[in-house]
Design a protein with these regions (language model features):
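Short coil-to-beta transitions that initiate beta-strands within beta-rich domains
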Residues: 48-71, 98-116, 143-157, 316-334, ...
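Juxtamembrane interface at the cytosolic side of transmembrane helices
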Residues: 2-18, 217-281, 464-492
Length: 492
């Protein structure tokens, strides 16, 4: 009889100690799973709320994608999830561009078309495609209203763009006939050249961020349920302890015995057999991987040395379909059947309109940024691999001098400018880059999304709070283990 009270006390007291932090991990984890939620990426908070380490990522949220006026190198427009801006003095001053009817979509990519020496820009947003018929023109709606378009790029013909609808569908569209949209059939695809093994770090990374089990949507739902379970378990556990304690101390305020019993049973059944049991798996893998991410350098060093057979990993790693896996797509001039896409396995190429895809061996199997600028295709990833390839050439060329992943590039005259999270980088010859003096808009504000990262990691409290977070997370793991044991003894 003594075992259950002792185990129950352990479960209860570590739960009360860790409840608040586990609740915060749950709710912020859900927010961070959904970077498509516009309000998270556009709600502004003071820069002072961010740590110095997080401030490095702030410039990327202001401006990721850029276009330069080919007739005036001081005239630029640029955009990101926070909106669109224009400068006419090479970055000294920026003015915000307005969307019709005060709408404010997230800008996910810019496709730059040169038609009869006129510059046209097509914007991929979380609310379909928009267009600027000239860099000084207004922004107008083009097509696919209400759809999350994560990529758009120049197509194989002059008036055409190619894009990706919500990571799952590749489409073509003639900007002069925007209602006539062609979706490429991806139901029967063959994928060759994929690696036989995946390192442990990559698998656990995608698992923690909601890409590692099934499709992007289902994996995110499972992670969300893990976060919701943490919130409900923390709340119901605290309420059960607090109210029973309050009723014992203030018996005159307590409800009737029958109501107390009904309340206790209801809270217990929600806490243990429903949420507690269903949430075991996501809570465990999110907790363990969360501890590993608190010590990222050690985690990378350890995880990259361990290989796992791809066939033994969850369904999504088998790549029986590429739907939900398409981060970016580029087309090639006068070759409608030729395309390249960026995926979790790096670049995949097709020459038959999407029936067969082959992995490009130049890059490691890693997510990256693939895009077209003029007659060049660019690719980079977080492994510090920076490549470009000119149309008509077969070999990728390495780029140097770039500290972080590249989001966009612009040719003007004999010059090439790269845009990444640190700022603007100008080519000095031979695809060697140095940071340029050009600046992005100074918004003097951070985003709520970045602040959620600060809370989730504990940096909002102190850079070394990760050790306390580890302790609380281990407490959560202990509760997940002891909870089913207690339930097996009591059942419903």
């Amino acid at each position: 009889m003594k075992k259950r009270p002792s185990l129950f006390k352990i479960h209860r007291w570590i739960g009360l100690i860790a409840a608040l932090w586990l609740f915060l991990l749950g709710i912020t984890g859900i927010f961070l799973d959904h970077d498509e939620w516009r309000w998270l990426r556009q709600t502004e908070v003071p820069e002072s709320w961010l740590s110095s380490s997080m401030m490095r990522y702030l410039p990327a949220t202001v401006m990721r994608y850029v276009v330069v006026d080919q007739k005036d190198s001081k005239h630029w427009i640029g955009g990101s999830e926070r909106g669109m801006w224009r400068t006419t003095d090479r970055g000294l001053n920026w003015n915000k561009l307005q969307f019709p009817k005060n709408q404010h979509p997230q800008v996910n990519r810019l496709a730059k078309l040169n038609i009869d020496d006129a510059q046209t820009v097509v914007l991929a947003t979380d609310d379909g495609l928009w267009i600027m018929n000239g860099l000084s023109s207004d922004i107008e709606r083009l097509a696919l209203q209400g759809r999350f378009i994560n990529m758009v790029s120049p197509g194989s013909d002059d008036n055409e763009v190619i894009g990706v609808d919500n990571f799952g569908k590749i489409f073509r569209l003639n900007i002069n006939q925007p209602t006539d949209i062609e979706f490429i059939d991806l139901d029967e695809t063959k994928i060759i050249g994929l690696p036989e093994h995946v390192n442990m770090y990559k698998f656990l990374f995608d698992l923690h961020f909601g890409y590692g089990l099934f499709s992007r949507k289902i994996s995110t739902w499972i992670n969300d349920f893990g976060g919701i379970a943490l919130m409900i378990l923390s709340t119901t556990g605290f309420l059960s302890w607090y109210l029973q304690r309050r009723w014992r101390r203030n018996k005159h305020l307590a409800p009737s015995r029958d109501k107390r019993i009904l309340f206790s049973k209801s809270v217990y059944r929600m806490h243990a057999p429903i949420i507690g049991l269903l949430g075991i798996v996501p809570i465990l893998y999110l907790s363990v991987t969360g501890i590993l991410f608190n010590h990222i350098l050690t985690f990378i060093d350890w995880g990259e040395k361990i290989d796992i057979e791809r066939t033994k990993l969850p369904y999504v790693w088998r790549y029986e379909s590429i739907k939900g896996e398409i981060d970016q797509v580029v087309a090639y001039p006068d070759s409608p059947d030729r395309m390249s896409i960026s995926t979790r396995y790096g670049i995949l190429n097709t020459n038959d309109g999407g029936l067969t895809w082959a992995r490009d061996s130049i890059t490691d199997p890693e997510r990256g940024q693939l895009f077209r600028a003029d007659d060049h295709v660019f690719y980079s990833n977080n492994l510090r691999q920076f490549f470009t390839k000119r149309d008509g050439e077969n070999e990728w060329i390495k780029m140097t001098g770039l500290p972080t992943i590249v989001y966009d590039a612009e040719f003007y005259g004999d010059e090439l400018m790269i845009k990444n999270s640190r700022g603007f980088f100008k080519e000095k010859g031979g695809y060697r880059f140095e940071m340029d003096e050009m600046k992005h808009p100074n918004l003097k504000a951070a985003t709520l999304y970045l602040f959620m990262i600060e809370i989730h990691t504990g940096n909002v409290i102190h850079p070394q709070f990760k050790w306390i977070s580890d302790l609380f997370t281990i407490m959560g793991i202990i509760m997940v283990i002891t909870g089913p044991i207690l339930w097996l003894r009591r059942k419903w």
